[in-house]
Amino acid sequence: MLRFILGLTALYLISVCAADVSAKSSKKNPTQEVQVTILSSNLANGATVGEWGLSALVEADGKCVLFDAGRHPDTVIRNAKVLNVDLTCVTDVVLSHFHFDHNTGLLPLLEDLRASNPKAIQRVHVASGFFLRRQYPQGDGFVDWNQMIDVRKKLEAAGVKIIEYNKPTEILPSIWVSGPVTRTHDEQKYGKARMLVDGKWVQDNVPDSQVLTILTDKGHIVLLGCGHSGVVNALEHVQSKIDNAPIHALMGGLHLFNASDEMLGWTADKLRNIGVQHLMAGHCTGIEPLMRLRTGLNLTRKTAVVGAVGSKFVYGEGVRPTSIAM
């Protein structure tokens, strides 16, 4: 009987350990080939066009994900054609938050891609709070401005599945969305815009602000839309909730264009301590703040550049800036 009990105990311990290893393995399954191409940002040259907006194509081990869709209806479509970037492979779109400068191009892009590939853009991934009613002050009152409430109906009518997340989730192998970011630090200031929550109007702190990260052998490749949660909060959230891996690359909008010198210094110190290895920031980051971060993080012109339209980050190679951003 004692042998039988010991045998069962051993089998139980083996099964528990195996399950634990399996869980860890499934959570961290690093991708090997990653390329990120900026399709919408403030800085552009050549035949591409710039705008106050953001969009990037993420290609990872044969998967294509579009991160945000730009401010104007045709910016992403036009820039992709100029750059010879084929977007018909896009099956998933991740939207960083509800602001129109990150999603106005989505419906026109859907129509354009479906003409060539009826299976393009099957899913749109957003964080909880994305479809809350929003208003901003105008004159003596307020006006509604979350256009995505109406856009949602059109997307669903076209057969697009919209998925909301309240926690970090792996949407494709090694590709994660953060869901709402834990805000430990008071990094961002919010104005008079408001949102309707449980029947009450409250200050809009953009709770749906989320990030996308790709797990690789060298760590996270993180994309922010505007960083309304705060870039430090976002990176700490990624490392604590998804995987405590290094931040191999950081790109997108960091919302530092109007940050004080004190805040820029604090942010640089934090990002240096976190260990950001490559930086390709644009949109609402600001040119001068990016230069401050480059210096503060001890990076160089080869590892920290403006994320202009056409700029790329290639895993295993690093940043490939356009001529205007070199």
Regions found by a protein language model. Give the residues of each.
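Binuclear metal-dependent phosphoesterase catalytic core
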Residues: 80, 290-291, 301-326
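Conserved beta-strand hairpin/beta-sheet module of binuclear metal-dependent hydrolase folds
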Residues: 35-83, 205, 209-224
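Active-site-proximal loop/helix segment associated with metal-binding centers of metalloenzymes
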Residues: 145, 170-217
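Boundary at the C-terminal end of the N-terminal hydrophobic targeting segment
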Residues: 18-23
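Bacterial N-terminal signal peptides
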Residues: 5-16
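Active-site HxH/HxHxD metal-binding segment of metal-dependent hydrolases
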Residues: 88-167, 179-189, 269-277
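Cap/insert and terminal regions of metallo-dependent hydrolase folds
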Residues: 92, 99-108, 123, 200-310
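Pre-active-site segment of Zn-dependent metallo-hydrolases
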Residues: 48-49, 63-92, 107-108, 114-116, ...
